């Protein structure tokens, strides 16, 4: 094994299984780890080990998620699988497990079911960029025409939610047979075909460091003789001394120049995604900047007040509300580092939202916030989290 350490690390990609209950998501997850371990490295995780997913907390919400890993010839995959439908909803909305792509598992015997549709819709809303399909339980369908029909239905469903249905790779197979080591077309070879589809159809993810610079403002200090220092954790990109930046959100956008980058009281030439840094800003006064704004590459992000969101409302057991809320509900929306009050408009025909529901809503904030589609937020009442959401579409 000594020579393994000379190999350059494989590119890391995050994926997960989605689809209707009992269509075989967990069996497929087990098969991927088994065949990955046999061919490319990693370790086999049995069905029972994956199914007993531990509970974890993301933004105060308890979610059961199984995390497994497997490799292909060129990539290292981190894969999430959830035991229950509610866990998927929470996982996707909170972004607890960000996916670069998803594997939609659909039973060839049953065809698309309500959760198949809901998971595709959620993927669209929360910004899962790519989906590949595994048509499972193909051993239970003798009729080739029936298989084709199910495949057509799945493609139509994907197209309906703006995924490229016609171009999506759809692999027919049986996760159970593959786990048993079956070498027919729908056994082990189908899993290898699926991994190949992941390798080719899901593009290499852009690393945070390669995206335009953005840092949420956590604190602002004025240092006599030096000017104003803004601290925060750099969310993406790289910032160098001398770079021009914008201060966006809450008030009118301002431009300034970074004259110093500090980490742990040391001066640096640059800071990058993941760093906790202090940025010295030229000519900016202490009162010009406040928590809740962001520093960013000029023109890369705009302030907005109105957007469509996909929201999960915490149940009473999760510490959420005990009662439903109605249209005109005005909680605080916690974006990055600050709470901003906003009004909720519910979809037509929805009178109220119960704790434990997920719902699409239009939110109007009282102050503008720097946002992109895909930005996560918490919904709070007096500092207590009562929901989680994601910006699905910016309106203005």
Curated annotation (Swiss-Prot):
Reaction catalysed by this enzyme: GTP + H2O = GDP + phosphate + H(+)
Locations listed in the record: Cytoplasm
InterPro entries attached to this UniProt entry: EF-Tu_GTP-bd (IPR041709), EF-Tu_GTPase (IPR050055), EFTu-like_2 (IPR004161), EFTU_2 (IPR033720), G_TR_CS (IPR031157), P-loop_NTPase (IPR027417), Small_GTP-bd (IPR005225), T_Tr_GTP-bd_dom (IPR000795)
Transmembrane segments: none
Keywords associated with the record: Cytoplasm, Elongation factor, GTP-binding, Hydrolase, Magnesium, Metal-binding, Nucleotide-binding, Protein biosynthesis
Region (G2): 60-64
Chain ranges of the tr-type G domain: 10-206
Single annotated GO MF: GTPase activity
GO cellular component entries: cytoplasm
Keyword Nucleotide-binding: yes
Annotated stretches, region: G1: 19-26
Gene Ontology terms: biological process: translational elongation
Coiled-coil portions: none
Family assignment from sequence similarity: Belongs to the TRAFAC class translation factor GTPase superfamily. Classic translation factor GTPase family. EF-Tu/EF-1A subfamily.
Quaternary structure (record): Monomer.
The protein, known as: Elongation factor Tu-A
Organism ancestry: Bacteria, Pseudomonadati, Pseudomonadota, Gammaproteobacteria, Lysobacterales
Gene name as annotated: tufA
């Amino acid at each position: 094994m000594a020579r393994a350490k000379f190999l350059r690390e494989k590119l890391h990609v995050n994926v997960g299984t989605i689809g209707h209950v009992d269509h075989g998501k967990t069996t497929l997850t087990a098969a991927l780890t088994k065949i990955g371990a046999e061919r490319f490295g990693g370790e086999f995780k049995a069905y029972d080990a994956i199914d007993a997913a531990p509970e974890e907390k993301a933004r105060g919400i308890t979610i059961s998620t199984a995390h497994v890993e497997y490799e292909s010839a060129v990539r290292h995959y981190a894969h999430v699988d959830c035991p229950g439908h509610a866990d998927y909803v929470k996982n996707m909305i909170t972004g607890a497990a960000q996916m670069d792509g998803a594997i939609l598992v659909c039973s060839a015997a049953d065809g698309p079911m309500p959760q198949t549709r809901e998971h595709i819709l959620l993927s669209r809303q929360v910004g899962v960029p790519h989906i590949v399909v595994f048509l499972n339980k193909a051993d239970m369908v003798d009729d080739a025409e029936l298989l084709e029909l199910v495949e057509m239905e799945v493609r139509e469903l994907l197209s309906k939610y703006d995924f490229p249905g016609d171009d999506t790779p759809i692999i027919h197979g049986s996760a159970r047979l593959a786990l048993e080591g079956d070498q027919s077309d729908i056994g082990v070879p189908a899993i290898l075909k699926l991994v190949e589809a992941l390798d080719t159809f899901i593009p290499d993810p852009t690393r945070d460091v390669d995206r335009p610079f953005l840092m949420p403002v956590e604190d602002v200090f004025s240092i006599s003789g030096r000017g104003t220092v803004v601290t925060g954790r750099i969310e993406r990109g790289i910032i160098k001394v001398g770079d021009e930046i914008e201060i966006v959100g809450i008030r009118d956008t301002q431009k300034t120049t970074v004259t110093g980058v500090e980490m742990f009281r040391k001066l640096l030439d640059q800071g990058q995604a993941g760093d906790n840094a202090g940025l010295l800003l030229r000519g900016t006064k202490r009162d010009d900047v406040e928590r809740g704004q962001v520093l960013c590459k000029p023109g890369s992000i705009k302030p907005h007040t109105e957007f469509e969101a996909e929201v999960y409302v915490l149940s009473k057991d999760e510490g959420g509300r005990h009662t439903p809320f109605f249209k005109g509900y005005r909680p605080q929306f916690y974006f990055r580092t600050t709470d901003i009050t906003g009004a909720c408009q519910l979809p037509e025909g929805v009178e109220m939202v119960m704790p434990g529901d997920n719902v699409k809503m239009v939110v109007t904030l009282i102050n503008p916030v720097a946002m992109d589609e895909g930005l996560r937020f918490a919904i709070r009442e007096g500092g207590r989290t009562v929901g989680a959401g994601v910006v699905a579409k910016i309106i203005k």
